Regions:
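Compact, glycine-rich, soluble single-domain proteins
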Residues: 1-105
Length: 105
């Protein structure tokens, strides 16, 4: 799976197992270059994360319902949604609430 944002192809990694959902981006040292997708998830935390991220929350139809740029470490975000995307910094600048997030397989 991938998406195109600002003419860049970005790989989407669906987190489907309990372990992958629990770990998410915690303890990652290398810069984040992919989008990590949590299904049936409307809250995240950034505890134990070593870098800031952008967050996008979608409804079941992939409509963007919430965007937050530059989420710092040790924060909790709780918003109503179906999918939560943890994204590289700067990704939110090209997106708008109300738009549909395009996912290609």
């Amino acid at each position: 799976m991938h998406t195109i944002i600002n003419d860049k192809k970005i790989k989407i990694i669906p987190l489907t197992t309990f372990l992958s959902k629990s770990k998410g981006l915690m303890f990652r040292i290398k810069p984040i270059k992919k989008i990590y997708m949590f299904k049936k998830c409307s809250s995240i935390h950034t505890f134990f994360m070593l870098q800031n991220i952008d967050v996008c929350i979608l409804d079941k139809n992939y409509k963007i319902v919430y965007l937050k740029e530059n989420v710092k470490k040790n924060r909790v975000l709780i918003k109503k949604g179906y999918y939560t995307l943890e994204m590289p910094l700067g990704t939110c600048k090209c997106l708008k609430v109300g738009e549909f997030f395009s996912i290609k397989k």
